[in-house]
Amino acid sequence: MVDLSVKIGGLTLKNPILPGSGTFSAELARVVDVNRLGALVAKTVSRESRIGNPTPRVAELEAGMINSIGLPTKGIDYFLNTQIPEYSQFTAPLVASITATTLDDFGAMARDVSIPEVSAIEINISCPTRAPDGGNFAMHEDQTSAVVERVCSSTDKPVWVKLSPNAGDIVSIAKAAEAAGGDALTISNTILGLKINTETFRPAIGNKFGGISGPGIKPIIMRMVHQCSQAVDIPIIGCGGICKVEDVVEYMLAGASAVMLGYIVFRNPSALTGIIDELEVWCDKRGIARVADLTGAMIDDPIVETYEAATAPIGQGHVSVHSTAAE
């Protein structure tokens, strides 16, 4: 039997498959056995209620979707009094996702959600659709550091930091989050983009710009996961374009310890548990006893002489053959 468990920021999860924040609600349990998931990540909540961005909020792309939801929420009181009792019926660990506009409010929010029902806190400092230009705390090292320090000093829960792919240097942001006390990184939020309706000449999204998600961004986010994994020692949760088990494996080989599914959950919620089953089968067929051993296991040969050597499956004669052209 394959051991699917992974460790993330002080938590041991039964498997590395999580729903991304904004894709999970208690209603999902009607179609998916959510108790099988590694953890449940709640939709981001803020102090006050928010109605979100103007419509239309979502448009389809060739390889994904673009959205500008704007983090609508009914506020912290509703989360604590209504949603927490709903989530408490499930056995998977609950991760509360919080956002705020000031350091004091981030600290207060962290204290508010530091309750027994919550196993970890994800701080969403990277939503690209709240400000018109996509700006957020995660675009800057000093602001990231300040928020993470304030949250970590306000709670004894593990703190996950959700980063932005729109930052100029995400590796520096990741290092700042780690130095400030973050226990894990979520890489990443959506990529800011634009889609235009060619019949109306207007933006397809009411807020003009939106966050792009889906298979089209996967190679970009995987590159960021790999680069950050080489620079920090805390676990990374990969998030972006994961639709099948091979995507999970790729992210883990690149350096992720777990993954979050977003885009695919809108199209096929049962993919959450289906991928768990497929991951166990995938590992078993290849003699991999622990899924955690996949993390960072990409073979990074700088020069490979033959196509056969480069593409040989693990356990079937893979060798590192370096060029001798200069000899």
Residue map of PLM features:
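N-terminal capping/small domains of soluble enzymes
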Residues: 1-94, 100-101, 275, 324-327
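Flexible loop residues that form catalytic
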Residues: 22, 45, 126, 190, ...
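Alpha/beta enzyme core
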Residues: 32-34, 39, 53, 101-237, ...
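C-terminal extensions of enzymes
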Residues: 252, 265-287, 292-327
